[in-house]
Regions:
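Conserved beta-strand hairpin/beta-sheet module of binuclear metal-dependent hydrolase folds
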Residues: 99-160, 283-287, 291-297
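Divalent-metal (often Zn2+) His-rich catalytic cores of metallo-beta-lactamase-fold enzymes
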Residues: 25-38, 292, 302, 318-382, ...
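Feature captures hydrophobic
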Residues: 453-456, 462-468, 472-479, 484, ...
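N-terminal pre-domain segments of enzymes
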Residues: 23-98, 102-103, 324
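Acidic/polar short surface loop at catalytic or gating sites that assists cofactor/ion binding
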Residues: 68-88, 197-247
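TPR-adjacent "capping" and linker segments in tetratricopeptide-repeat scaffold/adaptor proteins
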Residues: 358, 426-450
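Metallo-beta-lactamase
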Residues: 133-135, 141-144, 243, 247-253, ...
Length: 611
């Protein structure tokens, strides 16, 4: 079976957190805010903890999962500080979710049939019994965590042949370890089943926007933060990504419609194709023999992102809710267990249907109420400030904003319909941050006056207003250490109060950067190895975004290009600062004709070699 590999390397290239100052204490306002959370939610409900521990078989005794070179891939025991009551430096609701996510090991989901390894990475790896072997669902972020999970299964459940590897969607925490699984299994007949468009989407997301997304990733997942009660306590969707080698493998089979069935070694599966919701392409799986439903990442124990803070395409809350309703209609009468590729399973037909319905209603509500209020003339910021979930949803832990948030999800649905402009003429052509900051500071009466007003706001617990004041001052006077330190203190308190893991991580990472505790160099997540796996057409699109159009605006250059490794030809035309191409065309008047492999071309445009 011919395979092409994609070296993601995302986790390897991200900087480790630098040692910082002593942990900042929570202010009385933050303590009060976090104490109030305990009165709003039923922390005596321990059902999730019972489900998260149910079926436990074994876990690794090691302190960490390690890469081949001895470096830490995933710190298994780094989350022990989460034991006990939430401190004042953490939102108790997020702390509870993080405790659940930190539970790790091999678990039985359906006796003798379905097993999960959880807590070895951000996402789970699932094993489903066929007549004579296994189907593996998803492969975590990296080689080390995927192999650790697979070897734990072999140790406790036997060394059975793997008949198929299913990857539910093209996010790296689900496919990064797939090549390692393929090599470990060494079964040339093993099927690799993915949703249609998986390979292209995996490449495009991690390459086309990889550099900017990589830096935002490091903020969102708290990769630059220490793991303690004043730092990274998890993402809400899981703990954190493993670090190490990640490779993409070409699939052998694609699912493109709902209702498609496959029988692998005697086990029947029915697929639901659910694109443009949690991921550009994704699929869920029904196992009729086991009355078990794999919800991929469409139904989880959190309010998910309708627009992820790391950056991606907006997700359609209406479509998402309809997919879940279709799940209920198709399988609600028969299901006995539902499991996802994050978090823990849910058992029992009635309990599952209640859980599914709440998730469906939550996404529908966010979508519909955003549009209702937009049609009444409210801006996205106003909607996000005013909208609340109904009590029946708001009181459910599975509908809390641990990963997404009501605030930024509402803004995403507004953006999906109306774009970035809120309709206020003042926001049509605003000043850029530095110029705005300078005029803002001047209008208030200078930097010292801004700090005076900001300190008063800080002392009164008005952290959002304080952040606005100081953000403008830092843009106006980036070397003003008093402003930077105070803004870092503000971000820290906002992080301590945040129920969303990504919000907390963004705030606390921003605080570290303001204090000078982070290497500000942008991680380079794109290299020739990854880029050269793009198809020729997408590779040339990637080439085009490397062009500085403002410098090339007066140039007109035509080049004929032949890729020797795949045989494809293209005509490239640089004109008016834009680089267009036509696949399969040549131009007799071209300045030059070039024959090159995709790898050498990628190295050339990434300046890894000189022309």
């Amino acid at each position: 079976m011919k395979r092409k590999l994609f070296t993601g390397g995302i986790a390897v290239m991200l900087c480790l957190a630098m040692s910082g100052n002593a942990q900042q204490k929570a202010t009385s306002y933050t303590e009060k805010e976090n104490m109030a959370v305990k009165t709003r939610l039923n922390f005596n409900n321990r059902a999730d903890f019972e489900d998260a521990h149910r079926g436990f078989i074994a876990t690794l005794e090691d302190e960490a999962i390690k890469n081949e070179n001895g470096s830490v891939s995933y710190p298994l025991n780094a989350w022990k500080f989460l034991e006990g009551e939430a401190p004042a430096t953490a939102n108790p609701s997020l702390w509870r979710q993080s405790q659940l996510n930190a539970i790790h090991g091999l678990f039985e989901v359906v006796p003798g049939a379905i097993y999960q390894v959880r807590g070895f990475d951000l996402a789970n790896i699932t094993f489903v019994r066929t007549d004579h072997g296994w189907i593996i669902i998803d492969a975590t972020t990296s080689e080390a965590s995927a192999l650790a999970g697979y070897r734990l299964v072999k140790q406790h459940l036997g060394d059975l042949p793997v008949r198929a590897l299913i990857i539910t969607h093209p996010h790296i925490d689900h496919y990064g370890g797939m090549d390692a699984i393929c090599r470990e299994v060494s079964n040339k007949d093993m099927k690799i089943i993915v949703p249609k468009g998986f390979y292209e989407e995996a490449l495009s997301e991690n390459v086309m926007a990889g550099t900017a997304m990589g830096r935002r990733d490091s903020y969102m997942y708290g990769l630059l933060l220490p793991r303690h009660a004043g730092g990274n306590i998890g993402t809400g969707l899981g703990t954190t990504n493993s670090r190490g080698k990640s490779m993409l493998v070409r699939p052998t089979d694609e699912i493109e419609t709902t209702g498609e069935r496959r029988v692998i070694d005697g086990l029947e599966m029915e697929f639901m194709f659910v694109p443009e919701a949690e991921a550009p392409v994704e699929m869920m799986i029904w196992f009729p023999k086991y009355k078990a439903f794999c919800a991929a990442e469409e139904i989880t124990h959190t309010m998910h992102n309708l627009l992820t803070l790391r950056g991606a395409k907006v997700r359609n809350g209406l479509l998402w809710s309809k997919y879940i309703d279709d799940v209920i209609a198709r399988y609600g009468n028969d299901v006995e267990v539902t499991f996802s590729l994050h978090h823990w399973p849910t058992w029992g037909n009635e309990k599952i249907n209640t859980y599914w319905a709440a998730q469906r209603d939550m996404y529908r509500y966010l979508h519909d109420q955003t549009l209702r209020m937009a049609n009444q003339g409210l801006t996205p910021n106003e909607i996000a400030e005013q909208l609340v979930l109904p009590v029946g949803l708001d009181s459910l832990f599975a509908c809390r904003g641990y990963y997404g948030s009501l605030s930024h999800n509402v803004k995403s649905q507004y953006q999906m319909y109306f774009g970035w402009f809120d309709g206020n003429p003042a926001n049509l052509n605003p000043l850029p941050p530095v110029e705005l900051g300078r005029k803002y500071v001047e209008a208030i009466g200078g930097g010292e006056r801004v700090i005076e007003v900001a300190r008063k706001a800080y002392d009164e617990g008005e952290y959002r207003w304080c952040a606005t004041l100081l953000n403008n001052l830092v843009f106006a006077e980036p070397e003003n250490q008093t402003a930077r330190q105070l803004l870092a203190d503000v971000y820290t308190q906002l992080g301590y109060q945040a129920e969303s893991g990504p919000w907390r991580n963004f705030y606390l990472t921003g605080a570290k950067e303001l204090r000078g505790e982070i290497n500000r160099q942008v991680p380079n997540l794109v290299n020739a190895s990854s880029v050269s796996n793009l198809g020729a057409d997408m590779l040339l699109d990637f080439c085009a975004i490397q062009v500085n159009g403002m410098k090339a605006g007066d140039k007109r250059i035509c080049i004929n290009l032949t890729f020797k490794d795949c045989g494809e030809k293209a005509m490239l035309l640089l004109n008016n600062g834009a680089l267009n191409h036509r696949m399969g065309y040549t131009d007799a008047s071209a300045l030059l004709s070039l024959q090159v492999t995709r790898n050498d071309f990628a190295r050339l445009i990434l300046k890894e070699v000189r022309p």
